Curated annotation (Swiss-Prot):
It comes from Liriodendron tulipifera. The chain crosses the membrane at residues 2-22, 32-52, 61-81. InterPro entries: NADH_UbQ_OxRdtase_chain4L/K, NUOK/Mnh_C1-like. This is NAD(P)H-quinone oxidoreductase subunit 4L, chloroplastic. GO terms for molecular function: oxidoreductase activity, acting on NAD(P)H, quinone or similar compound as acceptor; quinone binding. NDH is composed of at least 16 different subunits, 5 of which are encoded in the nucleus. The gene is ndhE. It is found in: Plastid, Chloroplast thylakoid membrane. GO terms for cellular component: chloroplast thylakoid membrane; NADH dehydrogenase complex.
Amino acid sequence: MMTEHVLILSAYLFSIGIYGLITSRNMVRALMCLELILNAVNLNLVTFSDLFDSRQLKGDIFSIFVIAIAAAEAAIGPAIVSSIYRNRKSTRINQSNLLNK
């Protein structure tokens, strides 16, 4: 019963993240939605790792790697967004095509 609730929560978080990525026009909001997606994936990894084989921590260890990648993305992403804002004076995704320059 608890596993079903966790998986429903994970699917809900993933759906919110995908919806936000599709509809968002702001880069900061898109980064936040990407973090929601990564957290939903981590929740699934830990849940299925505990469900199928609780003695081996493969899902937990992989989840730690995903958290490390998300931390790097959380550090580098806003720096890139602020750099684009300084050059383009906008954080809107449709106005930040850097190939047109």
